[in-house]
Amino acid sequence: MAVAKTPGSVGLISLGCAKNRVDSEILLGELARRGHAITPDMKGAETVIVNTCAFIDEAKRESIDAILEVAARKGKGVGKLLVAGCMVNRFGQELARDIPEIDGFISLDSLLEVETIVNLGGAAPPPSPSHMVFDHTAPRLLTTRGYAYLKVAEGCNNPCTFCAIPLWRGRFRSRTIASLVDEARQLEEQGVGELCL
Protein backbone atom coordinates (compact mmCIF):
# COMPACT_ATOMS: atom_id res chain seq x y z
CA MET A 1 0.00 0.00 0.00
CA ALA A 2 1.40 3.37 -1.01
CA VAL A 3 1.79 6.02 1.67
CA ALA A 4 0.28 9.39 0.79
CA LYS A 5 2.87 12.11 0.55
CA THR A 6 2.39 14.91 3.07
CA PRO A 7 2.19 18.26 1.31
CA GLY A 8 5.25 20.44 1.84
CA SER A 9 5.59 23.35 4.20
CA VAL A 10 4.55 26.78 2.99
CA GLY A 11 5.56 30.20 4.30
CA LEU A 12 3.98 33.48 3.27
CA ILE A 13 5.25 37.05 3.28
CA SER A 14 2.31 39.47 3.23
CA LEU A 15 2.94 43.04 2.13
CA GLY A 16 0.58 45.96 1.71
CA CYS A 17 -2.88 46.82 2.92
CA ALA A 18 -5.51 45.11 5.06
CA LYS A 19 -7.17 43.73 1.92
CA ASN A 20 -3.90 41.96 1.14
CA ARG A 21 -3.81 40.57 4.69
CA VAL A 22 -7.26 39.05 4.16
CA ASP A 23 -6.11 37.65 0.80
CA SER A 24 -3.06 36.17 2.56
CA GLU A 25 -5.28 34.59 5.21
CA ILE A 26 -7.44 33.06 2.46
CA LEU A 27 -4.31 31.65 0.76
CA LEU A 28 -3.10 30.18 4.06
CA GLY A 29 -6.58 28.89 4.92
CA GLU A 30 -6.91 27.08 1.60
CA LEU A 31 -3.43 25.56 1.91
CA ALA A 32 -4.08 24.44 5.50
CA ARG A 33 -7.43 22.97 4.43
CA ARG A 34 -5.56 20.95 1.79
CA GLY A 35 -3.11 19.60 4.37
CA HIS A 36 -0.07 21.82 3.85
CA ALA A 37 2.02 22.68 6.90
CA ILE A 38 2.08 26.46 7.36
CA THR A 39 5.29 27.85 8.82
CA PRO A 40 6.29 31.36 9.92
CA ASP A 41 9.94 30.40 9.31
CA MET A 42 10.69 31.38 5.71
CA LYS A 43 14.10 29.70 5.90
CA GLY A 44 12.46 26.36 6.64
CA ALA A 45 9.61 26.61 4.14
CA GLU A 46 9.68 24.36 1.10
CA THR A 47 7.52 26.91 -0.76
CA VAL A 48 7.43 30.64 -0.07
CA ILE A 49 4.63 32.87 -1.33
CA VAL A 50 5.22 36.62 -1.50
CA ASN A 51 1.87 38.45 -1.51
CA THR A 52 2.79 41.75 -3.12
CA CYS A 53 1.59 45.34 -3.07
CA ALA A 54 1.74 47.65 -6.08
CA PHE A 55 0.00 50.75 -4.76
CA ILE A 56 2.95 53.16 -4.57
CA ASP A 57 6.55 52.99 -5.78
CA GLU A 58 7.88 52.28 -2.28
CA ALA A 59 5.50 49.32 -1.94
CA LYS A 60 6.56 48.00 -5.35
CA ARG A 61 10.22 48.24 -4.33
CA GLU A 62 9.50 46.45 -1.04
CA SER A 63 7.69 43.70 -2.96
CA ILE A 64 10.54 43.31 -5.47
CA ASP A 65 13.09 43.23 -2.63
CA ALA A 66 11.12 40.49 -0.85
CA ILE A 67 10.85 38.46 -4.07
CA LEU A 68 14.59 38.81 -4.74
CA GLU A 69 15.44 37.87 -1.15
CA VAL A 70 13.45 34.65 -1.44
CA ALA A 71 14.83 34.00 -4.94
CA ALA A 72 18.36 34.16 -3.51
CA ARG A 73 17.42 31.33 -1.09
CA LYS A 74 16.13 28.99 -3.78
CA GLY A 75 18.14 25.79 -3.64
CA LYS A 76 19.27 26.68 -0.11
CA GLY A 77 16.15 25.45 1.64
CA VAL A 78 13.48 27.18 -0.42
CA GLY A 79 12.25 24.92 -3.20
CA LYS A 80 9.61 27.10 -4.85
CA LEU A 81 8.91 30.81 -5.04
CA LEU A 82 5.38 31.92 -5.83
CA VAL A 83 4.23 35.50 -6.21
CA ALA A 84 0.69 36.66 -5.44
CA GLY A 85 -1.19 39.92 -5.10
CA CYS A 86 -1.58 43.18 -6.92
CA MET A 87 1.79 43.08 -8.68
CA VAL A 88 0.77 39.83 -10.36
CA ASN A 89 -2.38 41.38 -11.80
CA ARG A 90 -0.55 44.52 -12.90
CA PHE A 91 3.05 43.42 -13.65
CA GLY A 92 2.96 39.61 -13.76
CA GLN A 93 4.44 39.24 -17.23
CA GLU A 94 7.27 41.67 -16.45
CA LEU A 95 8.02 39.78 -13.22
CA ALA A 96 8.11 36.49 -15.15
CA ARG A 97 10.50 37.98 -17.70
CA ASP A 98 12.79 39.76 -15.23
CA ILE A 99 12.86 37.25 -12.34
CA PRO A 100 13.02 33.72 -13.79
CA GLU A 101 13.39 32.23 -10.30
CA ILE A 102 9.63 32.70 -9.81
CA ASP A 103 7.92 29.31 -10.15
CA GLY A 104 4.32 30.46 -10.30
CA PHE A 105 1.89 33.34 -10.06
CA ILE A 106 -1.32 33.62 -8.06
CA SER A 107 -3.61 36.32 -9.42
CA LEU A 108 -6.23 38.01 -7.27
CA ASP A 109 -8.86 35.82 -8.95
CA SER A 110 -7.00 32.55 -8.36
CA LEU A 111 -6.49 32.62 -4.58
CA LEU A 112 -8.50 29.42 -4.11
CA GLU A 113 -6.41 27.68 -6.79
CA VAL A 114 -3.27 28.16 -4.69
CA GLU A 115 -2.71 24.46 -4.03
CA THR A 116 -2.63 23.64 -7.75
CA ILE A 117 -0.20 26.51 -8.31
CA VAL A 118 1.99 25.33 -5.37
CA ASN A 119 2.10 21.85 -6.88
CA LEU A 120 2.38 22.70 -10.58
CA GLY A 121 3.45 26.33 -10.84
CA GLY A 122 1.61 28.76 -13.03
CA ALA A 123 2.27 31.26 -15.78
CA ALA A 124 1.96 34.98 -15.24
CA PRO A 125 -1.46 36.21 -16.29
CA PRO A 126 -1.84 39.12 -18.69
CA PRO A 127 -2.52 42.43 -16.93
CA SER A 128 -6.16 42.45 -15.92
CA PRO A 129 -8.42 43.68 -13.13
CA SER A 130 -9.84 41.25 -10.59
CA HIS A 131 -13.51 40.29 -10.73
CA MET A 132 -13.81 38.06 -7.66
CA VAL A 133 -15.27 38.88 -4.28
CA PHE A 134 -14.53 36.24 -1.67
CA ASP A 135 -17.23 35.59 0.89
CA HIS A 136 -17.59 33.89 4.25
CA THR A 137 -17.19 30.42 2.69
CA ALA A 138 -13.54 31.03 1.71
CA PRO A 139 -11.22 29.26 4.16
CA ARG A 140 -9.20 31.69 6.25
CA LEU A 141 -6.26 31.19 8.61
CA LEU A 142 -6.08 34.25 10.86
CA THR A 143 -2.70 35.92 11.30
CA THR A 144 -3.72 38.31 14.08
CA ARG A 145 -4.91 37.75 17.64
CA GLY A 146 -8.07 39.27 19.02
CA TYR A 147 -8.92 41.26 15.91
CA ALA A 148 -9.48 40.58 12.23
CA TYR A 149 -10.19 42.50 9.07
CA LEU A 150 -13.58 42.09 7.46
CA LYS A 151 -13.35 42.87 3.76
CA VAL A 152 -16.72 44.45 2.95
CA ALA A 153 -15.98 45.32 -0.67
CA GLU A 154 -13.36 45.00 -3.36
CA GLY A 155 -12.14 47.32 -6.10
CA CYS A 156 -12.91 50.95 -6.87
CA ASN A 157 -14.88 52.87 -9.50
CA ASN A 158 -13.01 56.18 -9.18
CA PRO A 159 -10.58 56.84 -12.06
CA CYS A 160 -8.16 58.98 -10.02
CA THR A 161 -5.08 59.96 -12.00
CA PHE A 162 -2.77 59.18 -9.05
CA CYS A 163 -4.15 55.70 -8.32
CA ALA A 164 -4.21 52.47 -10.30
CA ILE A 165 -6.22 50.29 -7.90
CA PRO A 166 -9.09 49.81 -10.41
CA LEU A 167 -6.54 48.46 -12.92
CA TRP A 168 -5.78 45.42 -10.77
CA ARG A 169 -8.40 45.21 -8.01
CA GLY A 170 -11.18 45.84 -10.54
CA ARG A 171 -14.41 47.79 -10.36
CA PHE A 172 -16.13 48.27 -7.01
CA ARG A 173 -18.23 45.34 -5.86
CA SER A 174 -19.77 44.81 -2.44
CA ARG A 175 -20.36 41.66 -0.49
CA THR A 176 -23.88 40.86 0.66
CA ILE A 177 -24.92 41.81 4.17
CA ALA A 178 -25.74 38.15 4.88
CA SER A 179 -22.21 37.10 3.90
CA LEU A 180 -20.66 39.80 6.10
CA VAL A 181 -22.81 38.82 9.09
CA ASP A 182 -21.95 35.12 8.59
CA GLU A 183 -18.24 35.88 8.44
CA ALA A 184 -18.45 38.17 11.49
CA ARG A 185 -20.09 35.34 13.43
CA GLN A 186 -17.45 32.86 12.26
CA LEU A 187 -14.69 35.23 13.34
CA GLU A 188 -16.34 35.73 16.74
CA GLU A 189 -16.48 31.93 17.18
CA GLN A 190 -12.71 31.89 16.53
CA GLY A 191 -12.13 34.32 19.40
CA VAL A 192 -12.03 37.57 17.45
CA GLY A 193 -13.28 40.42 19.64
CA GLU A 194 -12.71 43.34 17.27
CA LEU A 195 -13.52 43.64 13.58
CA CYS A 196 -11.73 46.21 11.43
CA LEU A 197 -13.71 47.28 8.38
Language model regions located:
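Proteins enriched for Cys/Gly/acidic motifs involved in redox and nucleic-acid/cofactor modification
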Residues: M1-C196
